[in-house]
């Protein structure tokens, strides 16, 4: 399953879909990240690593590294580079590290929004997004289909 490639929503090459300080454009994720950044990081890592690193494993490693070194950004900045490489977004490793070191929460929420903008349902993880795409019968992952809430 991890070897499958999902094609997401197209976006202008070379740029992030949202600004670095646009944390409040997704208030729910902003609050979750502020309270427990390991959750957002785990969700990002699961998608970026295409299911090879689970949300729980990545989140636990993030917490462990943050507890030991006081700097979870040592781990999370690597994923910013992976996102840039996957989507041809301009930047470099030094800037990635600085952004995570200076404002970890802004960096994590921007990465979360980027993946969400590209069509991933962050709550499903990689495997859930693959399954969702297969159930829709598509080859490439486009914009997520609207699924209504509970009805009576």
UniProtKB/Swiss-Prot annotation:
It is found in: Membrane. Keywords: Membrane, Transmembrane, Transmembrane helix. The keyword Transmembrane helix applies. One of its GO terms (cellular component) is membrane. InterPro entries: PLAC_motif_containing. Coiled coil: none annotated. The chain crosses the membrane at residues 57-79. It is a single-pass membrane protein. Pfam families: PLAC8. Its main location: membrane. It comes from the Eukaryota. Belongs to the cornifelin family. May be involved in heavy metals transport. This is Protein PLANT CADMIUM RESISTANCE 3. It comes from Arabidopsis thaliana.
């Amino acid at each position: 399953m991890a070897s499958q490639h999902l094609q997401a929503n197209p976006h202008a090459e070379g740029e992030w879909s949202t600004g670095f300080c646009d944390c409040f454009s997704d208030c729910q994720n902003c609050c979750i990240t502020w309270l427990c950044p390991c959750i957002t990081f785990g969700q990002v890592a699961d998608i970026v690593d295409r299911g090879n690193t689970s949300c729980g494993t990545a989140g636990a490693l993030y917490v462990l590294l943050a507890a030991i070194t006081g700097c979870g950004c040592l781990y999370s900045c690597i994923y910013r580079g992976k996102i840039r490489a996957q989507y041809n977004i301009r930047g470099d490793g030094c800037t990635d590290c600085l952004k995570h070191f200076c404002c970890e929460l802004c960096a994590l929420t921007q990465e979360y929004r980027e993946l969400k903008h590209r069509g991933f349902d962050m709550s499903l993880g990689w495997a859930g997004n693959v399954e969702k795409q297969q159930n829709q019968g598509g080859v490439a992952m486009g914009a997520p289909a609207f699924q209504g809430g509970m009805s009576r």
